[in-house]
Amino acid sequence: MELTSTRKKANAITSSILNRIAIRGQRKVADALGINESQISRWKGDFIPKMGMLLAVLEWGVEDEELAELAKKVAHLLTKEKPQDCGNSFEA
């Protein structure tokens, strides 16, 4: 039972990390770390899930507030309206 709980936490942590990378952009994250963007791609398959499990075992956890904030950011990005292309267009 404890292993299942730990795996669920690990999956939540891994998902949170991957979502944050997606929101910030893989290139920006790589630049901030001083590595090549392709390294981030390699990490996604192996390193990040292992780190998620390590953090879960250490009971690092994912805060509900962090997930809520992440959800708000994603929703904002998805609903962001584009400005009109032409200044002459007017809707009456």
UniProtKB/Swiss-Prot annotation:
Keyword rRNA-binding tagged: no
GO BP: regulation of DNA-templated transcription
Protein name listed in UniProt: Transcriptional activator protein C1
The organism's place on the tree of life at top rank: Viruses
Record family assignment: Belongs to the lambda phage CII protein family.
Pfam families named among the record's database cross-references: Phage_CII (PF05269)
InterPro entries in the record: Cro/C1-type_HTH (IPR001387), Lambda_DNA-bd_dom_sf (IPR010982), Transcrpt_activ_CII (IPR007933)
Coiled-coil residue spans: none
Record-level Gene Ontology MF annotations: DNA binding
Subunit and interaction comment: Homotetramer.
Keywords tagged on the record: Activator, DNA-binding, Transcription, Transcription regulation
DNA-binding region: 26-45
Main function: Binds to two promoters, P(RE) and Pa23 and activate transcription from these promoters.
SUPFAM superfamilies in UniProt: lambda repressor-like DNA-binding domains
